[in-house]
A protein has these predicted regions:
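Extended, low-polarity segments enriched in aliphatic/aromatic residues
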Residues: 57-113, 117-349
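Post-signal-peptide N-terminal segment of Sec-exported extracytoplasmic proteins
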Residues: 42-58, 86
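Short, low-complexity, disordered segments immediately C-terminal to signal peptides
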Residues: 21-46
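C-terminal motif of bacterial Sec signal peptides marking the signal peptidase cleavage site
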Residues: 15-19
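Positively charged n-region of N-terminal signal peptides that target proteins for export
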Residues: 1-9, 21-22, 303
């Protein structure tokens, strides 16, 4: 009898130890994964003493992202000037003209003075879906109605066709298919409204180039991660199309030259919906500011980080995380498009 009791006690002890081990492993996994907010941050969340010296050196070499909370023509001018960049030739200013009737596109009164001072041309491409911007005639009317033609020339880059710029070493796509008029410009200001997006999670500098500079067939090509150039922009592999966006932007950077392109994001009217939506949801989050950089990855990462820190961010965070939006930045950094580590500089300090 004693022998039987001993065996039973031994089995109980073994089961207890096994359960304890499982809980420890579970805890280890939870700790390693971190919170969504931690994963969103471009810089390291935790740092050991041994890493501090290396981290300090990395941060010292990190690209600058310039910031102002002043969302006004003078604030926009100030962050632009902080870039210490001047176009050397004909300047294209890439914006989204916005889908009618009520999208949150950047207003003429905000961006007009800067664009005029630079003698820039507002450039866009037609869309690859229905709506008011799928044909040149309709799109030109939208540009006029939304005030873009009141302060600058307006160029639909795909109006006379398209051209291809190669992607070097792409996993998803091997070319960018852009409007043919893109060849007419030597310098580029990518002026983006940062906001949520139903398919990408968020839209900023990377999306404004990857989709905005693409011709309609180029848009389908990126959305389908290189599988087709006609048909629907709907896709089945979310990460693949996010990766295709990053690869498309490398083609643009390589073709025009990194020194010929800069990026500005305006963080106002932060709806969960893109400016391609004519009936966007009202924002729950307050306006944040204007940011500028020569690095599109650092710029979009800084904007995401500010969203994670902001009050009223629940709906926008849900949209970003539902679509795995941060993977765009992870992959873009991996392929050398830019850095998720950056130095944020307030131009008003």
């Amino acid at each position: 009898m004693k022998r039987i009791l001993s065996v039973i006690l031994l089995l109980v002890l073994m089961l207890s130890l096994s359960a304890c081990g499982e809980k420890s492993a579970e805890a280890a996994v939870t700790t390693d994964q971190g919170t969504d907010a931690e994963k969103a941050q471009g810089t390291n969340v935790t740092e050991t003493t041994a890493m501090k010296e290396e981290s300090a050196e990395t941060e010292a070499n990190a690209p600058a992202v310039y910031f102002t909370a002043d969302i006004s023509p003078s604030g926009l001018q100030k962050v632009y000037e902080a870039l210490n960049w001047t176009p050397r030739g004909k300047l294209a200013v890439k914006v989204s003209t916005g889908e009618p009737p009520a999208s949150n596109y950047l207003r003429a009164e905000l961006i007009g003075p800067l664009v005029q001072s630079l003698d820039g041309t507002i450039v866009e491409c037609n869309t690859a879906y229905g709506g008011s911007r799928s044909s040149s005639v309709m799109h030109r009317q939208v540009a006029e109605d939304h005030g873009f033609t009141s302060f600058a020339e307006f160029d639909l880059m795909d109006e006379d066709g398209e051209t291809e710029w190669p992607v070097t070493g792409g996993k998803r796509i091997d070319k960018a298919i852009v409007g043919s008029h893109a060849e007419n410009y030597s310098d580029w200001l990518i002026l983006s409204h940062f906001k949520g997006h139903a398919m990408a999670g968020f839209g900023g500098a990377i999306k404004n180039v990857a989709i905005g500079m693409s011709s309609p067939s180029g848009k389908v090509y990126v959305h389908s991660a290189g599988t087709r150039t006609t048909g629907s922009i709907m896709h089945s592999d979310q990460d693949a199309w996010l990766e295709a966006m990053g690869e498309m932007v490398t083609a643009v950077r390589d073709h025009v030259g990194q020194e010929h392109i800069v990026y500005i994001n305006v963080m106002n009217r932060l709806s969960v919906d893109c400016d391609c939506d004519g009936h966007p949801a009202e924002p729950d989050i307050h306006d944040i500011g204007i940011l500028a950089s020569t690095d599109p990855v650092a710029l979009d990462q800084a904007c995401c980080d500010l969203v994670y820190q902001a009050e009223g961010n629940k709906a926008l965070l849900k949209r970003i995380e539902r679509q795995d939006g941060l993977h765009t930045l992870e992959y873009a950094e991996q392929i050398g498009l830019g850095s998720r580590t950056y130095t944020l500089i307030n131009v008003n300090d």
